[in-house]
Regions:
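Nuclease and nuclease-like effector domains acting on nucleic acids or nucleotide cofactors
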Residues: 2-91, 99-163
Length: 163
């Protein structure tokens, strides 16, 4: 797995150059490098046996060694905020969260999300929790929640959490 992860990271980082200002907002990932990916086992029909079961996210979360290796490779490869490669300033995060059926290990769904900016990891975590509740309560469809994250989670925050 380690060799495969390294190969995927190299392909993802070096076949697509990261142009300056590629993200519309520094809190959003580069859509070409991180388009998002879903877990095929999670569908609208299975939410009550998957994501809505307490402990689901923990049961599918990849190991810290996997995500840390990926984070360092991405930061070193240029996927960072204005040249800041300090790992502590980032959380390797799932663009489409596990809580709404995001793929646990797909490189296309993982990115070094900044912690030190206004639209950073803490705000996205609030949206993840809010949409998870709405999906499990049947007030938002799974597909809608996944789309919020893959298109523009900041706009989703403003709509579902507040200003």
């Amino acid at each position: 797995m380690r060799g495969r992860l390294g190969a995927l990271v190299v392909v993802a980082l070096f076949t697509t150059a990261l142009p300056a200002g590629a993200a519309r907002n520094p809190g959003l990932p580069n859509a070409r490098l991180t388009p998002g990916a879903t877990n095929p086992a999670v569908r609208q029909a299975t939410i009550h046996s998957t994501i809505c079961v307490p402990g689901y996210s923990s049961s599918v979360r990849p190991s810290e060694s996997y995500t840390e290796r990926l984070k360092f490779a991405q930061l070193d490869g240029g996927y960072n905020l204005r040249g800041d490669t300090r790992a502590s300033h980032y959380e390797e995060d799932h663009l489409i969260p596990l809580e709404v059926g995001g793929s646990p290990t797909a490189v296309a769904n993982l990115w070094p999300e900044p912690r030190t900016i206004f639209w950073g990891a803490a705000r996205k975590d609030r949206l993840e929790n809010a949409l998870h509740r709405l999906v499990c309560d049947g007030r938002v469809s799974l597909a809608t929640a996944q789309r919020v994250f893959s298109v523009d989670w900041i706009a989703g925050y403003r709509r579902y959490v507040g200003p």
